[in-house]
Amino acid sequence: IFLVINSNKQGIFYTDYKIAHIQALFTAQPNVKVASFQKLTVEFCKEIGATQIVRGLRDAKDFEYERSIGHMNHAISGIDTVFFLTAQAHSAINSSIIREMYQNGADITPFVTKPELLV
């Protein structure tokens, strides 16, 4: 699992905190590694020897955006992108909505795995 550092978005948690949270979710799966980077995704893939990128799609808007990036990534690196559809129950969830709920004290338990680790 790797986190992309998006300079256009203002997160409420530092990258190291996000990595620690994800690692805590996968303690029973020691083969799962977590990292972050501030470069092109395909450059990171080359560094770690990855040959595919896996992305989740919530809706048609995600597809259009990810398809363009996937085509460009393949053109510059030969690395393919594989898409999975998000479960319908989760398709309306996005980080901006969850962030606003969290900052306003709303219960995010139905939407976030182990939210108690966020404290």
Annotate each PLM feature:
Residues 1-119:
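Nucleotidyltransferase catalytic core that binds NTPs
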